[in-house]
């Protein structure tokens, strides 16, 4: 198993409030890793540290192949924000222009499952779930090897969510590496290869999904 990225003893505080404490784990090639925990557990802060938006107070990130650099990874943030004045197809074309070797337009449209009417309407006319799906597909346009997703299925209905996970399955078969945050236990148990549970800024569980399924002592529960 190839370790692409090693996170070692990451600590972060805001205004003397500890948000992350001694966070350590590995990101392995071709694996789908779930960071789970209640709102405020520190998941999004950790993603921000990984992509360089926030500096850790201490700790190290070993990324020898520079996969965390913007040209080698993609990021889907927790909140989708599109400019209201652009149509769906215009946003797709804009994102294609960012990359030397983007996904072909036909493949992008196939991934969105949008018809001609949806492609030519203003993006704010899409449902919340459709906007999340579009945001996800946009994160794939540059054909990244590392995909970071922060609460990707929020606002998706059951149908869109099922379709989203079918795309994740295809990405896993293509040996893409995925790190995502979630608080949907049923999703992470179904799709992830490894689950990392963060509680009050600390990792309290870091184990393979298969072992968690079969080990009663590792059963996961989240409460608000």
Language-model regions: role of each:
Residues 36-38:
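The feature captures the beta-strand-to-loop junction immediately N-terminal to the Walker
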Residues 58-71:
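Conserved ABC transporter NBD signature motif
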Residues 80-134:
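ABC-family P-loop ATPase nucleotide-binding domains
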Residues 147-151:
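Catalytic Walker B motif of ABC-type/P-loop ATPase nucleotide-binding domains
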Residues 188-190:
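A short, surface-exposed alpha-helical micro-motif characterized by mixed small hydrophobic
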